[in-house]
Amino acid sequence: MLIKLEIPPGLYKNGTEYQAAGRWTDANLVRWFENTLRPIGGWQTMSSTQFSDVARGMHGYFDNSNNRRVIVGTTSNLYVYAEGVSQSNITPSGIVTGRNDAASQVGYGGQLYGEHAYGVARPDNEQYDPVTTWTIDNFGEDAVCSATTDGKIYIWENNPSAIATVLTNAPTSNQGVLVTDERFVMCLGAGGNPRKVQWSDQEAATVWTPASTNAAGSLEVASDGKIRAGIVVRGQVLVLTDTSAHALSYVGTPFYYTQETAGSNCGIISAKAVAVTGTAAFWMGEKSFFRYDGGYTVPIKSDVSDFVFNRLNQSQRSKIWAVINGQYNECWWFYPSSSSTEIDSYVAYNFVDDTWTVGTLA
């Protein structure tokens, strides 16, 4: 006699196999979609030309003539793939070379003098300078870009034969850049201030000094942490620090943007660990996952979080990268496991079916 097994979709990897009785406990390169188990499709090569170093930022869009543009930032270079044109190097002149790997701060000068008592063993809380990452967005058909170890804002004016150049008058020593729905260019961690957000005049990317005749301005998020990321969601700018979340809303003259705390104890684990759908943002924190849909940040119950965070290479966590696969209602996080210094694993969340899956890429 055959007995039909009613196994719920998704993986359960928190705890023992005994505790997961009646659930799937392991998988690789499969997904659950509409309550059915399906294989994950393969990958397709976009170009046979390899980069000289590792890609750490990417943004795709269409220009005003409906030509596809894909901007890719690597540790030391900036490239564009243009419709009908091969890879073009648009690296700006004088850019600061970045880091391929997170670097330990345990050397001389890496910590505060006198922080611990003499003769007492130090706690195991080694700190790391994060890997270089890029933020890239389009301002109309042009692209604005910034690398974390360089900090300047560059603009590429939609010409594959021309390199990107420094955006005139923009602040330096930034953590990132984005373009708001109202068409302000906005810098995160502006001028080296870890909590400062600064924006240009509306529709005028080179006007940054506030005046009665323009809408340029700035604010500081009310956080005890440092800004790591920002993303546009539901008409707001969601700013994520390493401890909290903040929603910036456009209010017009005279302040232009106001802020509200959208969550505490929900800091993001890396600068690229957030992705957005049309209605919500999802990100990975230090030990859990979070969602923001325009109200307040809520933690996402995960059936695989113990597995993921226990095998994560903490020293290289700044390489974690999130993407949305809208076709299957999924948010994916790619991360390096404890046996690798580069990304070799993934965890994916189906935000419609509320299911999880994991796997490896190598």
Whereabouts are the PLM-identified features?
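N-terminal beta-propeller domains
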Residues: M1-A117, I155, N174-H246, W333-Y349
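Beta-sheet-dominated scaffold domains
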Residues: L2-K4, S223-A362
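A short beta-strand motif characteristic of beta-propeller blades
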Residues: W43-Q50, G119-D124, A162-T168, N214-E220, ...
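Repeated scaffold domains used in trafficking and secretory/extracellular systems
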Residues: S52-Y61, V96-I136, N169-E182, G225-A229, ...
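Assembly/oligomerization scaffold segments
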Residues: S65-R68, P130-T132, D137-E141, T149-D150
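Beta-strand initiation motifs
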Residues: S86-N89, P160-T165, T206-T213, T253-T258, ...
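Hydrophobic or amphipathic alpha-helical targeting/insertion segments
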Residues: S88, F139-A164
